[in-house]
């Protein structure tokens, strides 16, 4: 199904060097692309293929399992075509950044702020990249796998747990 998906065919035609992987699982297609081309690819998906809704932006931390360490995931929906597409782009730990797609979908603005706040991925050229959930003085990014379980500077609980 993934290889016959219209979006996949068009992406491979226009961005053959940027499409790194295509997978299909339970009817949902995921396309992994180069992070350097994320804005151009997203512009194409919105303007040419009618993926007019960015429903979510999130990130996965693959600490110790694969490189690049982070994967930024964009969940897209085409209202006229009633079709979903997941786009992923790898982000290395060193220089942990990717260009913002808030210029493509305004809804991505706060979603990218959440990813920045909780995972520490910087979105280049974002109009207002600052914490959205944690306080401004919070140290670190609590959804990273190397973040201390009890929080920064706290001793592990020594009492009974059950």
Curated annotation (Swiss-Prot):
PROSITE patterns: COMPLEX1_30K. Its EC number is 7.1.1.-. Pfam families: Complex1_30kDa. It is a peripheral membrane protein. One of its GO terms (cellular component) is plasma membrane. It comes from the Bacteria. Disulfide bonds: none annotated. One of its GO terms (molecular function) is quinone binding. Keywords: Cell inner membrane, Cell membrane, Membrane, NAD, Quinone, Translocase, Transport, Ubiquinone. Transmembrane segments: none annotated. It is found in: Cell inner membrane. It is an enzyme of class 7 (translocase). It catalyses: a quinone + NADH + 5 H(+)(in) = a quinol + NAD(+) + 4 H(+)(out). NDH-1 shuttles electrons from NADH, via FMN and iron-sulfur (Fe-S) centers, to quinones in the respiratory chain. The immediate electron acceptor for the enzyme in this species is believed to be ubiquinone. Couples the redox reaction to proton translocation (for every two electrons transferred, four hydrogen ions are translocated across the cytoplasmic membrane), and thus conserves the redox energy in a proton gradient. NDH-1 is composed of 14 different subunits. Subunits NuoB, C, D, E, F, and G constitute the peripheral sector of the complex. Belongs to the complex I 30 kDa subunit family. This is NADH-quinone oxidoreductase subunit C. It comes from Geobacter metallireducens (strain ATCC 53774 / DSM 7210 / GS-15). The lineage of its organism: Bacteria, Pseudomonadati, Thermodesulfobacteriota, Desulfuromonadia, Geobacterales.
């Amino acid at each position: 199904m993934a290889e016959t998906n219209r979006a996949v065919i068009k992406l491979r035609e226009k961005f053959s060097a940027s499409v790194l992987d295509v997978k299909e699982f339970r009817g949902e297609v995921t396309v992994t692309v180069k992070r350097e081309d994320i804005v151009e690819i997203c512009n194409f998906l919105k303007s040419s293929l009618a993926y007019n809704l960015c429903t979510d932006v999130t990130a996965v931390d693959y600490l110790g399992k694969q490189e690049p360490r982070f994967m930024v995931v964009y969940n897209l929906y085409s209202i006229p075509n009633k079709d979903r597409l997941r786009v992923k782009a790898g982000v290395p730990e060193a220089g942990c950044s990717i260009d913002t797609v808030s210029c493509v979908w305004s809804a991505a603005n706060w979603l990218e702020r959440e990813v920045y706040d909780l995972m520490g991925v910087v979105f280049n050229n974002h109009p207002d990249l600052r914490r959205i959930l944690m306080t401004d003085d919070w140290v670190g990014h609590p959804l990273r796998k190397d973040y201390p379980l009890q929080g920064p500077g706290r001793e592990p609980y020594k009492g009974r747990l059950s």
